[in-house]
Amino acid sequence: MSKTPRTQPGRLSSRFWRLLGASTDKNLNYSSAEVTAAAAYHKEAADLGDEQLRKACGLLNLNDLADSRDVPQFLAIVREASERSTGLRPFDVQLLGALRMLAGDVIEMATGEGKTLAGAIAAAGYALAGRHVHVVTINDYLARRDAEWMGPLLEAIGLTVGWITAESTREDRKAAYGCDVTYASVNEIGFDVLRDQLVTDVDDLVSPHPDVALIDEADSVLVDEALVPLVLAGATHRETPRLEIIKLVGELSAESDYDTDSDSRNVHLTDVGARKVEKALGGIDLYSEEHVGTTLTEVNVALHAHVLLQRDVHYIVRDDAVHLVNASRGRIAQLQRWPDGLQAAVEAKEGIETTETGEVLDTITVQALINRYATVCGMTGTALAAGEQLRQFYKLGVSPIPPNTPNIRDDASDRVYITAAAKNDAIVAHLAEVHETGQPVLVGTRNVAESEELHERLLRHGVPAVVLNAKNDAEEARFIAEAGKFGAVTVSTQMAGRGTDIRLGGSDESDHDRVVELGGLHVVGTGRHHTERLDNQLRGRAGRQGDPGSSVFFSSWEDDVIAANLDRNKLPMQTDEDGRIISLKTTGLLDHAQRVAEGRLLDVHANTWRYNQLIAQQRAIIVDRRNALLSSATAREELAELAPKRYEELAQALPKEEAEERLETICRLIMLYHLDRGWADHLAYLADIRESIHLRALGRQSPLDEFHRLAVNAFALLAADAIEAAQQTFETANILDGAPGLDLSKLARPTSTWTYMVNDAPLSDDTLSPLSLPGVFR
């Protein structure tokens, strides 16, 4: 199935895009009518035996899901099969959600409404239509859990299901990808795609052709993680900032030696700081040609690590290692690193042995990875707020699915204070007051440091709270399962993707009625996040499936989102006796600050996307070329044409019955090696360009246009250089000495490789200009 071309982001208003991002009532009504029509087939499905049910499913014609008359029968059969195999009978709203995913939408379905089952039904529909489905999760735990949970349903209707985690072997992966439905984390799917770019035999390929991606927690994967590069690295020696520079930067003064911007995204030396560094390094000129790409880069990297990256906010230190914290999930970002020496600089700052970065052999962003699929759909509890990005970058619509039972959660207005200190005092007092009643409380904080500070204050005030953050995320399922227990107070960092429902009365619901009488779970937010979605994810933990619940957020004018996006001089300052601001404008001001923050994030996404788009296009050309070399006689034919005398010499020297096959293998190895070598060198060149491209603005050049010009020119040379190098190797390689074979020492590949994710810095704000890629390979 061909894929609809995706256009570049426009400049239309947020409200306009968000409206476009939502599917129309007409579409929802059509799907609802099909759910209603399924009722006519329920008795018929219930009367079928298990084998008859499986056979009936196989007879359905779902090849054109948008115009199939068999959809109501499919819904009736899958509902019956689900109840028999899992004990779960899908509600109408779950069937509706599945249909909207089968229509290619991202659905918004509230926490606790059964997204996992709806996703399995949608996956079944695609698979029965002959499609291969990847259910993409945010971590390995959910991939395996959901595959094992939903597997009996899929198998009951004649489908095969598999799952992949980091521990899966190559054989496990090939078997799982061979199933009709495969559950895997976005990381593992991406790493398999990258690792396939090192194979030299087509039989060693693991990752299949991308067909359908059904994405759980779609906003987290498609928006929050969109620009995270997945990296395949090989062992090599790379320079990191010198220890003397890291130590020197640590001694600089914030008052005089360096400045940061208002939202702490950038830091730079002042003239005073530059002179101090130059003197300490022996009187050098940091901005001379000799040092601008070396010493100055080391200083800037060390400065970034020392000033902008804060322990227990951006990272934690555990088991003598630096672990990045995913800001949108509040968890350790597994396998994630900072690029270009920054990881080593942070490790040196913390007195930890620096780890190897290696040479980047291949890389792909999550956004480019997902855009490979012919069909993309998904589910999340907060899709509408991400509708703008889903529309712009993936051309996806959003379908809001009503809850099975109306939501009765009481969401109170924000309580706003002038200072963070006053806000924190009010939070502690509020939590102590609620705890006295026995009502369970879930507190959402914005980072690890804040969660631990609040936890300590609560303990001092006699409130027996538990804390869940990136430092103890291995225990999260147990903590969250008991967060609805009578008297429980749970302090947690961001709740996105926690994957465990909070049941009133605890995991066994023994105190359910008592907690219901108290008002259900009470959610407290310690401040607005940079996007409305994260606030809604936290609120959504209360009021599950019609349960009572409540939420309230505390904010202050000193909070990051407000301080960076509102003029403090124009904010109301009159307070009541408790220090709470008295003004009808507070909610509107907070909403405005959040919208500004969201707009900035969208700009960052769009601008970074414009750089990554070219790299993704170039990578696609490399992949096509590599696949041609792997699966055909292209390499042998090209080298025979380029070096006919050498080819004939080798053909005559080798046994006639094996000459062609032997030469095909040899030519393929040579061509693949030099193609891969050229691509790795090209990626290193692009990384170097990106480090200094912003300086082009000083010369009144467009950084983006310059990046495109340099990248396109270099890529055009890559093809010619790779083929020329392959020809030279073919003509000089030791092929005839001893047993016929290639001297592999001349084609040495990395002795070890590993995969990781890069927490990459956003690039400058530029306007996208038209670009074109030459047909660099024949």
From Swiss-Prot:
It catalyses: ATP + H2O + cellular proteinSide 1 = ADP + phosphate + cellular proteinSide 2. It holds the Pfam family P-loop_SecA. Gene3D superfamilies: Helical scaffold and wing domains of SecA (1.10.3060.10), P-loop containing nucleotide triphosphate hydrolases (3.40.50.300), SecA, preprotein cross-linking domain (3.90.1440.10). Keywords: ATP-binding, Cell membrane, Cytoplasm, Membrane, Nucleotide-binding, Protein transport, Translocase, Translocation, Transport. GO terms for biological process: intracellular protein transmembrane transport; protein import; protein targeting; protein transport by the Sec complex. It is an enzyme of class 7 (translocase). It is found in: Cell membrane; Cytoplasm. Its EC number is 7.4.2.8. GO terms for molecular function: ATP binding; protein-exporting ATPase activity. GO terms for cellular component: cell envelope Sec protein transport complex; cytosol; plasma membrane. The keyword Translocase applies. It is a peripheral membrane protein. ATP binds at residues 94, 112-116, 501. The keyword Ribosomal protein does not apply. Its main location: membrane. Monomer and homodimer. Part of the essential Sec protein translocation apparatus which comprises SecA, SecYEG and auxiliary proteins SecDF. Other proteins may also be involved. NCBIfam families: SecA2_Mycobac (TIGR04221). Part of the Sec protein translocase complex. Interacts with the SecYEG preprotein conducting channel. Has a central role in coupling the hydrolysis of ATP to the transfer of proteins into and across the cell membrane, serving as an ATP-driven molecular motor driving the stepwise translocation of polypeptide chains across the membrane. Belongs to the SecA family. This is Protein translocase subunit SecA 2. The lineage of its organism: Bacteria, Bacillati, Actinomycetota, Actinomycetes, Mycobacteriales.
